[in-house]
């Protein structure tokens, strides 16, 4: 292999006999390294490892397939170089049975090979996510019914306290806690352990608990924030004359806070907070000029005081009641944990009845097979695990940062220990963004912080930091931002020099518009106070649409630059050169696409930008899906008026609003179905009013009612998927939606519903009722499937996708939008919180007194979960930044630009390189992390200028990153993108001194009105000509220098003068060419032979009877008896109807164009050569003409252009010289030499 590996990559590839953690930063080639290590294992003669003796687990099926494919390609290339290698042949043969797979696939393989060890039926099946949800809901409803029947007091108290109005909240808690517990290797044991935390003994001391440790740390961070605010104000007022009397109180406050920060025990900090007091600020008249500083100082001190009092009242003193609170909370938590374990049993039984397992079972059953207990009850590898440990020579774990605890135990059970350590883990903890799937980045961090970088270590760490993806401008920006914001508190890793990416991507130097500074675009959502009174509501855009218009403007600037701008270029590896940017090079990334993507799609479409949003919502709201579901609902139960009316109004029903009114008038007390039935049957049993129902409506009712009855009979005997497709075709609805706007997407949605029904028939639920129930539960549980995907990878559209979906991908241009969107912290406000280490954090509830408030434990968990959520958000931001190859643009909106920039500058007002932890924790969105970092960059001057309060920030001047910061008002985007303005346009016009500059403006108006496009002639150059079109479009002129052309004027003969009797001359010519193409030239010696061949063409349906009659067999005989026909028959190589394409310079056709400007403009010439044959290694070209001609010289002039280009193309096509060029005129049986 010719890859040039870096030294650290070589170490990762060749380091033997150890547990190896490879911390591979974004774009550092981790997959290539992993593949190469696998290769070296199997091609190294000294090791003699077969590829099936290696276990390679990946995160996704796509990653596993790619890995296997890359290994296969590499082995094939090696085999080409050494085709006799038995080992390479063997490894390629073993590749298909290799263990390169997802962790779930491996676990499934273990289960299938060892099902007898856990008493599992070998014929089990895996239920999909939707069937699992349905089964869980059924199990949960049954469980709750049983508990109510038992009148279980603990359950009843639990339902009163946490159930809400209809127990739905308690059901959500049970399901959530069950799912969360599945992330533990032993879920029931974890539930039992967390319950013990609430059963307090008499010697309980909060200061000794795990909760106190977390709370102490959080309080310390908040205290540091308070101290920093006071220090910043003190630094500001120290140099302001007139505020000297504030210095001592502020210094005293800082000392008090410092004292609290340095306390290390809970009891001591509690005592100090109780004694905490604040001296009153001395009052003294000050100069009005310093009043703003005085007010700022007072307000900051009041804010700090309020914060400290809040900590004392809401946290410190709350611990005094913890013992009493826990006495009441413990029985509730006991009932909750027992309820979850009962649910586990019921759900497990339901799966067993159906002989199925779910995805959680796959890992847990595998774990059960691979573990056992020793005599002390400790977990040890089972016999099966030891067999796998012996079998696998090395275990590779890709994307290790996304592993969970269950997977960690599984890998530990089958990996070797001590001197035979064989675990290879590769990943990047900075890209761990799947905590919601129970991923545990702590597993990676534990090894990252404990493994040694020294060679020979049994637990070794190697860092890959050379980025081969992104331009230096992007790498510099990534390092600049994350060195300031990613720390152990927020991000769970201190991003220092060792974690910085190093730019190693190869981008050839280019003088044009490419790459460039990272751009930050901030829009102020605040309405303009001077807004015109007549502004209409349409222009009052919401924040998402405003940002979408900004993005559309930026995309158009890149893809469709104005005349005075150069086109943006991107480097294309396939052509190894720069090319103009295309829409498909641009991806808009969002934290979440729901609500945002539709607005962006609309605005981009309005701007003429093709766009595709990869969303997971909107499917069930599509009109075609709603219509079909309504149809299914009334087939199941026709008495439902809402879906019935929806169907009647749809194209399937075809009823008008007036029709529905007439039907409703029949009887207002009964359903529409009953009304239709009464009309159909002319029922006289009830006093219906049918007089106003005319024959037309009666006929329509009868037709619809008959169809409905037929469908209701058919659905009983047909599988649901077949029935749905039958409906599509019988009603013609599938074709109908295909003709609607967005028809391809709509038909894809219908096919997706059909496929979903196909999957449904394979699950344990059957029938139309259950299918409708299944769909309704999907809708109610927010499991929207998203629109069906209809775009391929190479469609030239801008893509909108979530940051999560972009992980592992790369794109030339990334626009990170929605950077001002608030972080979603709703999960930390639930009534019961869960944490792996800290256990349960419930609300204190008292149903009798109707009170509830968060326990101190819930406050601890809330703070801890907020930190972990923010850490995840920071890693998500890192993933977004590192997707960009050549250009990174960040956009976001803020509520008030001045207040926001002041907040940013205040956060950036610190001496350390890292931004303060408290400001990172209190950030609301991505912009609150990016903004302060950019504010202290030299390029962030606009942030510092707009900030209403002057901060003397310590600028970071030694950094290589380059930024462009743009600030907009919401008013900039009121109308269309082309109408964007930088300031109030009315005021701008009024400020112009028109009287003093009339002549200047007059000249400018004339200049603009008389402007002509410099290259207008190029717009008239055709991209492609056929040779015959060339002959028609241009008139030949003979000059001394060769052939020139001029465009003639043609006047068409009026239609009424044109006759149409039989075949036209053109049609007769086509038929003659067809016969001459297919005729066998070895059988043209007589009339009968040629006639027989023409008849065969009729029989084979090449031509019709009428067309055959237009053929003159005698004309064909004369051709083959002519000089040129005889020469053709003698040739061994005759070619007929040969198509060609040839590029020529546009100036060759358009002589009026300047040569130096249009030399590179090409025109494509295409045509079909009737016949050519070889003669003495040279070519003879023959073109047939069936026209009725008069003057031979006029024919020569008419066709010379065509034959000229035929000859030129033929020489270029074959590389041989064309010796002679002939026209054969069938009308005169004449050969014309045009050589």
UniProtKB/Swiss-Prot annotation:
Domain UvrD-like helicase ATP-binding per the UniProt entry, residue ranges: 3-471
UvrD-like helicase C-terminal domain span: 509-808
GO BP terms, alphabetized: double-strand break repair via homologous recombination
Superkingdom per UniProt: Bacteria
GO MF annotation: an example: ATP hydrolysis activity
Listed Gene3D superfamilies: 1.10.274.50, 3.90.320.10, P-loop containing nucleotide triphosphate hydrolases
A Pfam family it matches: UvrD-helicase
Reactions the enzyme catalyzes: Couples ATP hydrolysis with the unwinding of duplex DNA by translocating in the 3'-5' direction; ATP + H2O = ADP + phosphate + H(+)
CC cofactor: Mg(2+)
Binding residues annotated for ATP, in chain numbering: 24-31
Keywords for this protein: ATP-binding, DNA damage, DNA repair, DNA-binding, Exonuclease, Helicase, Hydrolase, Isomerase, Nuclease, Nucleotide-binding
GO CC list: cytosol; DNA helicase complex
EC number(s) stated in the UniProt entry for this protein: 3.1.-.-, 5.6.2.4
Function, in words: The heterodimer acts as both an ATP-dependent DNA helicase and an ATP-dependent, dual-direction single-stranded exonuclease. Recognizes the chi site generating a DNA molecule suitable for the initiation of homologous recombination. The AddA nuclease domain is required for chi fragment generation; this subunit has the helicase and 3' -> 5' nuclease activities.
Family recorded in the similarity comment: Belongs to the helicase family. AddA subfamily.
HAMAP family: AddA (MF_01451)
Record text on subunit structure and interactions: Heterodimer of AddA and AddB/RexB.
Protein name per Swiss-Prot or TrEMBL: ATP-dependent helicase/nuclease subunit A
Organism taxonomic ancestry: Bacteria, Bacillati, Bacillota, Clostridia, Eubacteriales
GN (gene name): addA
